[in-house]
């Protein structure tokens, strides 16, 4: 491949050269949402992070099979295998079938992802559609001796596994630390050890979501689905497993244990994790009740928001930080992102207004190289954006007459902005920006301003001023140029 991509491997705690197991094919699995409520900003971050990785790997010429699961069963209220299934609880409270809840919120999740310009994955498997595969996984772990049946449930034997392997190698924990921080909970007596986790849970009589198994009616533990579905669609060994850093422990740690216990080694080569979205330094999440949904951002309807923010503003806001750095929500930060995005999109639009010269005194090749170098450095999107802002300055200087650019360089500059702004970062021009009026009024405004140019040429200053004043009153900003005019609709 032309470019040498390095990515930070959480397992080894360092950046490593990305070398696919079966180039040019790449297998990538990312933990998707548990669909029992509307998607919030915390859901947008992993979706956008791994969308950029998907886009970039594709741009580098790899054939990527991107699997992002949907958790629609087995995710209990608490990680210690106690409490009610989150979706079943929502269904009970709303007096709906669990799959009605799943379908409703999944439709809304897809709509939000489409608004954010997140590409759909290659495969989007549901946990409830892979019960057979999860039962087979549990059988293999039982046969290997790393699990036990207890009162109709099956638990992973962490202590026994830890004698042969290292439980905690991903999160950097040892078993004593895990035991010291694991609470003894009521109803946990069937476990040998508080740190043991459920592979299969016995369904209580009132439990709606249940399937027959060799151990009786029940449902799979949360961790089983990703191991089973990753193996089914990507094989026993694949390249990348991603998710939020809050999944490192226990979810991804348990996935590694399940994989090793069932096949003798870890399925995953590179473990990647994005950092969290915070509000006043605290993780944003449904379980904490401090989240703002994406629809609330788009409409400005949450009490913490001073205005509405477009989907591309949200995307740009997230990409302005490196994916492994925390992002703290504030209206000020979002407004700054909105202005930055506007500057970038104006630069893209201005490219069409440039008349090439015979010679060039700008270095487009260097700009392109710097952008690729930043992406190859563990997807350093904030550095890419800073280079694109340098490109925007270049464009403004050319338009102002301070620099010149040849036709070939102009073509290359357009390609750089299109490749990085749209193809890789996944930004797009929003027809809905400024309430959609700019796109709707474009031809009319151009026609009026052309009449104004004619009026000025005829020294009809009254008509010229009337057109300008009326458009200004409607929110249009008019700028006279040597080639005629420019305009934009202010927010």
Curated annotation (Swiss-Prot):
GO MF annotations, alphabetized: ATP binding; cysteine-tRNA ligase activity; zinc ion binding
Cofactor entry: Zn(2+)
Entry superkingdom: Bacteria
GO biological process, any: cysteinyl-tRNA aminoacylation
Chief location bin: cytoplasm
Swiss-Prot/TrEMBL catalytic activity: tRNA(Cys) + L-cysteine + ATP = L-cysteinyl-tRNA(Cys) + AMP + diphosphate
Motif ('HIGH' region) on chain: 33-43
SUPFAM superfamilies assigned: Anticodon-binding domain of a subclass of class I aminoacyl-tRNA synthetases, Nucleotidylyl transferase
Record bears the keyword Phosphoprotein: no
CDD domains: CysRS_core
Keywords for the protein's UniProt record, in alphabetical order: Aminoacyl-tRNA synthetase, ATP-binding, Cytoplasm, Ligase, Metal-binding, Nucleotide-binding, Protein biosynthesis, Zinc
Motif ('KMSKS' region) on chain: 283-287
Binding site for ATP: 286
Positions contributing to Zn(2+) binding: 31, 226, 251, 255
SMART domains (alphabetical): DALR_2
Keyword ATP-binding: yes
Broadest EC class assigned to this enzyme: ligase
Compartments (UniProt record): Cytoplasm
Annotated family: Belongs to the class-I aminoacyl-tRNA synthetase family.
Matches recorded under NCBIfam families: cysS
Protein name per UniProt: Cysteine--tRNA ligase
Source organism: Bacteroides fragilis (strain ATCC 25285 / DSM 2151 / CCUG 4856 / JCM 11019 / LMG 10263 / NCTC 9343 / Onslow / VPI 2553 / EN-2)
